[in-house]
Amino acid sequence: MSEIRVKENESLEQALRRFKRQCARAGVLSEVRKREHYEKPSVKRKKKSEAARKRKFK
């Protein structure tokens, strides 16, 4: 879990911006989207191979 401490003389907007940046770096939102619905292992493998194919031909 991302956690920040609000520094002295730091506005709420600055702290919120810092928190959002930290969450983005940690990949929290992408992980939440990925886990939103269960995905069968066979579907995961299929998506992974399709992504590899796209990268290869790009």
Swiss-Prot record:
Note one Pfam family from the annotation: Ribosomal_S21
Official protein name in the record: Small ribosomal subunit protein bS21
Could you tell me which InterPro entries the record lists for this protein?
A: Ribosomal_bS21, Ribosomal_bS21_CS, Ribosomal_bS21_sf
The Gene Ontology CC terms held by the record are: ribonucleoprotein complex; ribosome
Location of region: Disordered: 30-58
| Taxonomic superkingdom | Bacteria
Q: Where is the composition biased (Basic residues)?
A: 43-58
Entry keyword annotation includes Ribonucleoprotein: yes
Keywords on record: Ribonucleoprotein, Ribosomal protein
Annotated GO biological process:
translation
**Organism, as annotated:** Clostridium perfringens (strain 13 / Type A)
Q: Which GO terms describe its molecular function?
A: structural constituent of ribosome
**Residue ranges, compositional bias (Basic and acidic residues):** 31-42
Q: Which family does it belong to?
A: Belongs to the bacterial ribosomal protein bS21 family.
